[in-house]
Amino acid sequence: MEVLKVASDSNPNSVAGALAGVIRECGGTAEMQAIGAGAINQAIKAVAIARGFVAPGGLDLICIPAFTDIMIDGEERTAIRIIVEPR
């Protein structure tokens, strides 16, 4: 599964397009990763926008948030992992 990394300066419309594309092409689940309040805000906005993108095709999306530990520059950080899948 491809992980979409979202930053606080990510454009939510662009992330939503990528998210909708992954869901349509892979026929199921996408995963996003965000660190920090700004990045999480952009990721959640992207889910809301992506719901509008896939709705005409008869899909609705749900997201499942979870914590995950990742390594950045040799340092362990806690990120939010958001699994997005059709309902």
What are these model-derived regions, one by one?
Residues M1-T29, A43, V47, R51, ...:
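Conserved mixed alpha/beta catalytic, RNA-binding, or beta-rich assembly cores of soluble enzyme
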Residues S10, I35-G38:
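Short beta->alpha linker loops
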Residues A37-C63:
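Short, hydrophobic/π-rich interface segment
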Residues A55-R87:
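C-terminal edge-of-domain segments
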